[in-house]
Curated annotation (Swiss-Prot):
Compartments (UniProt record): Secreted
Disulfide-bonded cysteines: 51-109, 65-120, 83-135, 90-97
Pfam families: RnaseA
Organism: Rattus exulans (Polynesian rat)
Bias kind Basic and acidic residues: ranges: 30-42
Residues bound to substrate: 32, 35, 66-70, 91, 110
Protein name: Ribonuclease pancreatic alpha-type
SUPFAM superfamilies, per database record: RNase A-like (SSF54076)
Record-annotated active site: 37, 144
Secretion signal span: 1-25
């Protein structure tokens, strides 16, 4: 009887650990957005190699070269506030995108045509544009960078 209870408890423990463990190291969509798109401290104005450095530092050149990425150089609170601004349709057809009401300081990184992994080489373009981001969750936070216009 004691062995049977122990076996049942052990089985339940294995089941629970198998369900919980895969989610432990998983990056949330909001955290991924921050890692891939937020750079409140920096700016590309002073460095033509900004994108090469940032894409590597933010782990977007691991296994392959991410072809395009945009960094936003504004406070996170300002970017999060876009989630309550003008709603627009996302490129994928969903209706959870929002367009910034004002232009923001951004840097576009584009993989150069001749660049091949593992030597990812990017062009760096600094600009002021409106951004379109997808927001989800409770609280409603940025989870995807859709476009700059």
């Amino acid at each position: 009887m004691g062995l049977e209870k122990s076996l049942i408890l052990f089985s339940l423990l294995v089941l629970v650990l198998g369900w919980v463990q895969p989610s432990l190291g998983r990056e949330s969509s909001a955290d991924k957005f921050k890692r891939q798109h937020m750079d409140t401290e920096g700016s590309s104005k002073s460095s033509p190699t900004y994108c090469n450095q940032m894409m590597k530092r933010r782990e977007m050149t691991t296994g392959s070269c991410k072809p395009v990425n945009t960094f936003v150089h504004e406070p996170l609170e300002d970017v999060q506030a876009i989630c309550s601004q003008g709603q627009v349709t996302c490129k994928n057809g969903r209706n959870n995108c929002h367009k910034s009401s004002s232009t923001l300081h951004i840097t576009d990184c584009r993989l150069k045509g001749s660049s091949k992994y593992p030597n990812c080489d990017y062009t760096t373009t600094d600009s002021q544009k409106h951004i379109i981001i997808a927001c989800d969750g409770n609280p409603y936070v940025p989870v995807h960078f859709d476009a700059s216009v």
